[in-house]
Amino acid sequence: MKTRVITAVVALIVFLPLLFLGGDYFKFTTYALGVMAMYEIVRMTFKETNIVILTLSSIVGALLFLHKDISSLLQYALVYLILIAMLATIVCTGHKIKIVEIGVIIFVTVYIFVGFYCLFMLRNFSLSHVAYLLLTIWFTDSFAYFGGMKFGKNKLSPKISPNKSIEGSVIGSLSSIVIAVLFFNTTSIFSNLLIAIIVTLIVSVIGQFGDLIESAYKREYQVKDSSNLLPGHGGIFDRFDSVILSAPCLIILLNIF
């Protein structure tokens, strides 16, 4: 518990000032988080740190974060060449790297970096947008955990995450309505309360799907945590699994409503 608390305090001391500063500071922060998450995923997938794959994946992420500074044609060409280079590693390693592994890495590269880029874009909207997203996820996770402990009887996904219950999931999502009401009354994110509640419930549910997706990935590769980069908390992918999926979802919903 002591290690967990110390890690959380240090992480907040580093993360919060960069979040408040926003701009290029937070852009670099979210990109760095994406690279660290990909480091964890590469290690899970290949059982070692494949520097070539990690580097190529990180370059794809950089192109996404710098897309406004690079011409579209050049960007598409570079991404295409990088994907070809990833596929070429199958031949260069004598088929030690499998096609399915490269396919997974290509998909997850997009999944991770789009998620973190959307988190950066939310900060560009306002600090309130990021605070809203993080608090929605935190409320959902916390109340789903305690609600499941108290009332959980039916497994949500027994083969992927046997400790999660349907009751806990529902309680977690319903608890997020508190965040909807709070941010409707204190910010200009939402035009009316009903929209705030609808968006928040959807974000809450999508965040839980993000958690299950990460759990499925870890179960596939038989690991408990994505890494030990955050002692007591696991890895970056462990901490941001819900955010990665819910950030793009929130941007889409805000454009719809």
PLM regions and their residue ranges:
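Hydrophobic cores of alpha-helical transmembrane segments in multi-pass inner/ER membrane proteins
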Residues: 82, 116, 244, 248-250
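Hydrophobic residues in alpha-helical membrane-spanning segments
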Residues: 18, 232, 247-249
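Juxtamembrane boundary at the C-terminal end of a transmembrane helix
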Residues: 252-257
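Membrane-embedded alpha-helical bundles of polytopic integral membrane proteins
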Residues: 1-165, 169-201
